[in-house]
């Protein structure tokens, strides 16, 4: 099986009903960085504290423009002899063009890596399923593990799951080992889990539209307010210390005539009328026919609000509780 070919699609399930599942991550992409100045360079570009990142931990982060608007939301970690991060494939080319602008002055090589396989493992007894192939499996205390050519990431939300950066051979071996035990699915299942977890999904339609706090990046420890300068720092700090941010990321669920696209508008029920509000970041339709939407909305939105996709009069979406506190 080619590393570029996704697993056969099936409609996603919520984490509470998900059997053991191997998930192809064709909608995500890997970037690797190597060289003596790699950590220093990333430290000046990303919102998180890359310099303090241990080899057994990852960090969420945003890469912003000078106005503090996100090119992308990413997950950064140690990988082989350097660093790496994973982001949505739709933003990688444009984000890399920005990231590389000043790299010519640093000893770091930045590569879009499509040779590695990105594989999700989620659902019932996912951790036990990996134990037979890997001597070291990550957990909540040590969310990153390294085993030969594979880096394994552990995500606690919405339920324990794993992301493997590996080789086609390891992917095939894992698929063979779990044949008859695990179902297969494409990246829509991983997207559904990210929506349920409240992990921001920034696709190309929403590039440079939002500051990190509008997508709850601070709630996921993806912003350091103590490190030195980085791109967009002034605006990100202003949002925290001057209360400049009025938006937050939400998980909505309900019915819609079709899953909205990234960048689509929503409407909020106000008495007998509907008022345009917010922006869709991501959406998916589940096996039971319901639709999940991740959206940026005003951060004073009432928990009992009723919304729908713009002009979808038959739709009805309600706010779902996120598994973390948003904070500032």
UniProtKB/Swiss-Prot annotation:
<dbReference type="InterPro" id="IPR029043">
    <property type="entry name" value="GcvT/YgfZ_C"/>
</dbReference>
<dbReference type="GO" id="GO:0016226">
    <property type="term" value="P:iron-sulfur cluster assembly"/>
</dbReference>
<dbReference type="Pfam" id="PF21130">
    <property type="entry name" value="YgfZ_barrel"/>
</dbReference>
<comment type="similarity">
    <text>Belongs to the tRNA-modifying YgfZ family.</text>
</comment>
<dbReference type="GO" id="GO:0005737">
    <property type="term" value="C:cytoplasm"/>
</dbReference>
<feature type="binding site">
    <location>
        <position position="28"/>
    </location>
    <ligand>
        <name>folate</name>
    </ligand>
</feature>
<feature type="binding site">
    <location>
        <position position="190"/>
    </location>
    <ligand>
        <name>folate</name>
    </ligand>
</feature>
<keyword id="KW-0819">tRNA processing</keyword>
<dbReference type="InterPro" id="IPR045179">
    <property type="entry name" value="YgfZ/GcvT"/>
</dbReference>
<dbReference type="GO" id="GO:0008033">
    <property type="term" value="P:tRNA processing"/>
</dbReference>
<dbReference type="InterPro" id="IPR017703">
    <property type="entry name" value="YgfZ/GcvT_CS"/>
</dbReference>
<comment type="function">
    <text>Folate-binding protein involved in regulating the level of ATP-DnaA and in the modification of some tRNAs. It is probably a key factor in regulatory networks that act via tRNA modification, such as initiation of chromosomal replication.</text>
</comment>
<keyword id="KW-0963">Cytoplasm</keyword>
<dbReference type="InterPro" id="IPR048451">
    <property type="entry name" value="YgfZ_barrel"/>
</dbReference>
<dbReference type="InterPro" id="IPR023758">
    <property type="entry name" value="tRNA-modifying_YgfZ"/>
</dbReference>
<dbReference type="GO" id="GO:0009451">
    <property type="term" value="P:RNA modification"/>
</dbReference>
<protein>
    <recommendedName>
        <fullName>tRNA-modifying protein YgfZ</fullName>
    </recommendedName>
</protein>
<dbReference type="GO" id="GO:0005542">
    <property type="term" value="F:folic acid binding"/>
</dbReference>
<keyword id="KW-0290">Folate-binding</keyword>
